[in-house]
Amino acid sequence: MNDSEFHRLADQLWLTIEERLDDWDGDSDIDCEINGGVLTITFENGSKIIINRQEPLHQVWLATRQGGYHFDLKGDEWICDRSGETFWDLLEQAATQQAGETVSFR
């Protein structure tokens, strides 16, 4: 994968997250902001999830209250380089815990 392909795929990921949160109809307030390649999700309780891209490594990094995760693209899925879990699974687990209600991005 070259840098432009990596940015296209990361942009696609950011857009999906932003669209899902724009359509969010849950009870808690969840905000999303993109600034300089960093996507920040802020929850009503003040907690945050930070997602950023690591261009030199062609990785997407996810920082939550539970910990930090690094994802490599394998086929058509972003996969954690330690646990083997998908990006969407870990993001939904963290968002659900931090929002206090079920959050789905798929």
Swiss-Prot record:
- Record GO terms (molecular function): ferric iron binding; ferrous iron binding
Signal peptide start and end residues: none
Check the record and name the PROSITE patterns matching this protein: FRATAXIN_1, FRATAXIN_2
Report the Pfam families cross-referenced here: Frataxin_Cyay
Q: Which CDD domains does the record associate with it?
A: Frataxin
Which of UniProt's keywords are assigned here? Iron, Metal-binding
Tagged with keyword Iron: yes
Extract the InterPro entries matched here: CyaY, Frataxin/CyaY, Frataxin/CyaY_sf, Frataxin_CS
UniProt superkingdom: Bacteria
Listed Gene3D superfamilies: Frataxin/CyaY
User: Which BP terms from GO are recorded?
Assistant: iron-sulfur cluster assembly
GO CC terms, sorted: cytosol
Q: What does this protein do?
A: Involved in iron-sulfur (Fe-S) cluster assembly. May act as a regulator of Fe-S biogenesis.
> What family is it from?
Belongs to the frataxin family.
Protein name, please? Iron-sulfur cluster assembly protein CyaY
Q: Give the organism, scientific name.
A: Escherichia coli O7:K1 (strain IAI39 / ExPEC)
